[in-house]
Amino acid sequence: MANQKIRIRLKAYDYALIDRSAQEIVETAKRTGAVVKGPIPLPTKIERFNILRSPHVNKTSREQLEIRTHLRLMDIVDWTDKTTDALMKLDLPAGVDVEIKVQ
């Protein structure tokens, strides 16, 4: 489409899963003749939590946990209807959150 691009943002806790999904999207888009910019790795969001190990005493003994959220960004330019149909039929793993915007 003229002067429009598809922006795809992937979010997952497992970096291997998100990289595999991004590679699938890139291969599918290139197979249909679209131009793909990316995947661009965005900064990893790290959430850290401290919880008490003991339910009663020992306040100084704590467990430290963290959740890492990995992000990837891709832009698909010069796309056709064939590209959108192929992307809609693409089956991605359940652990990957996909956000698609047409700009």
Curated annotation (Swiss-Prot):
It comes from the Bacteria. GO terms for molecular function: structural constituent of ribosome; tRNA binding. One of its GO terms (cellular component) is ribonucleoprotein complex. Gene3D superfamilies: Ribosomal protein S10 domain. SUPFAM superfamilies: Ribosomal protein S10. Signal peptide: none annotated. It holds the Pfam family Ribosomal_S10. One of its GO terms (biological process) is translation. Keywords: Ribonucleoprotein, Ribosomal protein. InterPro entries: Ribosomal_uS10, Ribosomal_uS10_CS, Ribosomal_uS10_dom, Ribosomal_uS10_dom_sf. Involved in the binding of tRNA to the ribosomes. Part of the 30S ribosomal subunit. Belongs to the universal ribosomal protein uS10 family. PANTHER family: 30S RIBOSOMAL PROTEIN S10 FAMILY MEMBER. This is Small ribosomal subunit protein uS10.
